[in-house]
């Protein structure tokens, strides 16, 4: 009997790949640079950007011999120039410089600038028709239809760099669109997975920041505790893969080993597994369509012992329900959802509201915005940024009454 043949083609990208990393000094950027560092002969760094960490940015520029670096804070240009004195690295500062970095010729761009500030640079990379590894949620949550349309028009390849969407991307390759019945995004359940609703309502900041599996920044860790992050991922999946809300399910999986599953018409389910390490999905993006040597630990299922799953609780975690509501409302509602959540999380961190009030502020903001009748398709990055600011202002005006109800 002949064995089933495995693909044994030459690397699709056997030469040196030119790469740029937007947000190089953040956690995603750090993981990306770690992978590039492991195989320096395969990559040439074109451009790097950072927010305000000039020392870290200059260090990376020197290590990887970057051609251009940009710091987002325009007041740091002099500091950046001084740090790069004696090198051939060109530098700039401010939004225009970051956009310039994104638009420079590169085979592959990591778009990892957080917040709305990452939208225009990501679009600049997309407009070049290059391959963009996307780690900025605002591009999809705040401008999904517009962003994906621009990518299609430019012939850009969008690769999802977060673990769940990268898992779906890999699993979706096992079938055709018309054969798909649903995708399943997994969630750890966060630190409050087994807590009663009354206890979740009163949870402290310290408790919300104790994620059981992932090491992440403060904002995303709180989003995980409220399951707002999973709501955002549902929205992202809808735009990224052109899925309806009814084609996206969420499954709580405390071990965070299975990151995404895809069910096909024949009832086959294809899943992607891996340790909870962001270097795994980033490595997939960096090597795509090839596979590169990873830096994360190998998966030892025998050591893990068991994988468990449970349905999400939309009552204890209303933020997840609100994401589906926003998707079905459309016309900018997902932008409002995201902006209101950011205002709510900032208020919780500042101890202005209880943990349970995060979802209430998001829901009240969405309802108020819908009643005002301002829904309209977003036609540009400026439209998305303007709506984001409008929603933040609306959430801020509703915040005092939400805080008063909780006191």
From Swiss-Prot:
Residue positions binding NADPH: 25-28, 53, 136, 138, 217
Residues binding 1-deoxy-D-xylulose 5-phosphate: 137, 163-164, 188, 211, 224, 229-230, 233
Keywords per UniProt: Isoprene biosynthesis, Manganese, Metal-binding, NADP, Oxidoreductase
Enzyme class at the top of the EC tree: oxidoreductase
Signal peptide as annotated in the record: none
MF-aspect GO terms: 1-deoxy-D-xylulose-5-phosphate reductoisomerase activity; manganese ion binding; NADPH binding
EC numbers, comma separated: 1.1.1.267
Record field: catalytic activity: 2-C-methyl-D-erythritol 4-phosphate + NADP(+) = 1-deoxy-D-xylulose 5-phosphate + NADPH + H(+)
An example Gene Ontology biological process: isopentenyl diphosphate biosynthetic process, methylerythritol 4-phosphate pathway involved in terpenoid biosynthetic process
Record: residues binding Mn(2+): 162, 164, 233
Cofactor: Mg(2+); Mn(2+)
SUPFAM superfamilies xrefs: 1-deoxy-D-xylulose-5-phosphate reductoisomerase, C-terminal domain, Glyceraldehyde-3-phosphate dehydrogenase-like, C-terminal domain, NAD(P)-binding Rossmann-fold domains
Pathway connected to this protein: Isoprenoid biosynthesis; isopentenyl diphosphate biosynthesis via DXP pathway; isopentenyl diphosphate from 1-deoxy-D-xylulose 5-phosphate: step 1/6
InterPro entries xref list: DXP_reductoisomerase, DXP_reductoisomerase_C, DXP_reductoisomerase_N, DXPR_C, DXPR_C_sf, NAD(P)-bd_dom_sf
NCBIfam families the record matches: Dxr
Family, similarity comment: Belongs to the DXR family.
Chain's role: Catalyzes the NADPH-dependent rearrangement and reduction of 1-deoxy-D-xylulose-5-phosphate (DXP) to 2-C-methyl-D-erythritol 4-phosphate (MEP).
PANTHER family tied to this protein: 1-DEOXY-D-XYLULOSE 5-PHOSPHATE REDUCTOISOMERASE, 1-DEOXY-D-XYLULOSE 5-PHOSPHATE REDUCTOISOMERASE, CHLOROPLASTIC
Stated name of the protein: 1-deoxy-D-xylulose 5-phosphate reductoisomerase
Organism, scientific name: Rhodopseudomonas palustris (strain TIE-1)
Source lineage: Bacteria, Pseudomonadati, Pseudomonadota, Alphaproteobacteria, Hyphomicrobiales
Gene name tied to this protein: dxr
